[in-house]
Amino acid sequence: MLSIIQRVNCANVVVDGQKVADINKGILALVCVEKEDTHQNFEKMTDKIIKYRIFEDEAGKMNLSLADINGEIILVPQFTLAADTKKGNRPSFSSGCPPEIAKEKFKKFVDIFKNKYDKVQTGIFGADMKVSLTNDGPVTFTFKV
């Protein structure tokens, strides 16, 4: 399981001209489920994102988590994170999870996340999404669990 998280002042996702997710201060997370991912991976990634201290405290130190600031999050499915880019000039997705399986795994991940944190919105799996954000910092991290 892969994720890129970005600290944002605001972010939104639009599909077919309709805003499907819209947050203020929090995290925009691009999330990729892989073939071998299990419930344990989903739990670990959820805990990592919720507890990772990327927000500044009163001293200006990155010492507060999403939960600490009561921030919002958008989970955006992003299968291209699993691309093999080592050879040539075109990404390979041969090791990726088939779409129907990936969609179900992403749903399970979102369900786990929503059970642990209540300010969760999502993009739409398989949709052509327009993602907008105001990055704060920028502060961006990559996770693999």
From Swiss-Prot:
E.C. numbers: 3.1.1.96
A single MF term (Gene Ontology): D-tyrosyl-tRNA(Tyr) deacylase activity
UniProt catalytic activity: glycyl-tRNA(Ala) + H2O = tRNA(Ala) + glycine + H(+); a D-aminoacyl-tRNA + H2O = a tRNA + a D-alpha-amino acid + H(+)
Gene3D superfamilies: D-tyrosyl-tRNA(Tyr) deacylase
Entry keyword Transferase: no
Cellular localization per UniProt: Cytoplasm
Chief location: cytoplasm
Residue window of motif Gly-cisPro motif, important for rejection of L-amino acids: 137-138
InterPro entries per the UniProt record, alphabetical: Daa-tRNA_deacyls_DTD (IPR003732), DTD-like_sf (IPR023509)
Repressor keyword on record: no
Annotated Pfam families: Tyr_Deacylase (PF02580)
Subunit: Homodimer.
Function: An aminoacyl-tRNA editing enzyme that deacylates mischarged D-aminoacyl-tRNAs. Also deacylates mischarged glycyl-tRNA(Ala), protecting cells against glycine mischarging by AlaRS. Acts via tRNA-based rather than protein-based catalysis; rejects L-amino acids rather than detecting D-amino acids in the active site. By recycling D-aminoacyl-tRNA to D-amino acids and free tRNA molecules, this enzyme counteracts the toxicity associated with the formation of D-aminoacyl-tRNA entities in vivo and helps enforce protein L-homochirality.
Family recorded in the similarity comment: Belongs to the DTD family.
Protein name as annotated: D-aminoacyl-tRNA deacylase
Naturally occurring in which organism (per UniProt): Francisella philomiragia subsp. philomiragia (strain ATCC 25017 / CCUG 19701 / FSC 153 / O#319-036)
